[in-house]
């Protein structure tokens, strides 16, 4: 599976993911944020400038995100990404609203949208983990010039004995 396919699954199939950032005391904070776009240059999301999440992103522009889909454990696909983010202002805001029409209900006027700022996760690395197939499928990936760092163990499907 290509990195772009994985990012597309994260953005379109999972969409709402948990973001972890660090606060001003270096303590972890999490929140659920929708991924609005995915392309060859990374993942895009937005937040309002008055939120604590915005302040954390501006102060320490690194995130770790995780998302999953599936009805039960053996139908679950999980994707995690960690990397660097940057504000791109209102660039791509119109495209975000076009591709995510539910946003119009949340921010119905141009005036209400002035509070929003778009962020790009532009380089990072991550892992795709699929328990819907047995043995489980695991793949590391990277983008934006980052290198893949293998973590944990590696499952070699043809040598898997099914945890016996």
Mark where each language-model region is.
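A short, well-structured catalytic beta-strand-centered motif of the EAL phosphodiesterase domain
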Residues: 32-37
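Charged, amphipathic alpha-helical segments
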Residues: 1-5, 50-51, 105
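A short, Trp-centered hydrophobic/proline-enriched beta-strand micro-motif
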Residues: 9-25, 63-67
